[in-house]
A protein has these predicted regions:
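A short, Lys/Arg-rich alpha-helix, primarily the initiator
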Residues: 1-17
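Alpha-helical residues within the helix-turn-helix
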Residues: 16, 27, 56
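Short alpha-helical DNA-recognition segment
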Residues: 19-38
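DNA major-groove recognition helix of helix-turn-helix/homeodomain DNA-binding modules
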Residues: 50-64
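Short, charged recognition helix plus adjacent turn
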Residues: 66-69
Length: 69
């Protein structure tokens, strides 16, 4: 499995634990919803700055995003 897909799956797993939809979460962290959806689907290479926004929005560390990959 490609790393983008693994990271996207991990982000989706953590986001669903928050109870927020993609749309509400993307709005919370200031990222376009369609971009965020493509990240979760593993279709986008994501910039580190956006990984930081996602981690902050999930209240996890960057290393937590990569746990189990």
């Amino acid at each position: 499995m490609m790393i983008q897909k693994k990271v996207g799956d991990r982000i989706r797993e953590l986001r669903t634990q928050t109870g927020l939809s993609q749309e509400k979460f993307a709005l919370k962290i200031g990222i376009d919803r369609t971009y965020f959806a493509s990240v979760e689907l593993g279709k986008r290479n994501i910039a580190i700055v956006n990984l930081e926004k996602i981690a902050d929005g999930l209240n996890v560390s960057l290393s937590d995003l990569f746990k189990g990959l």
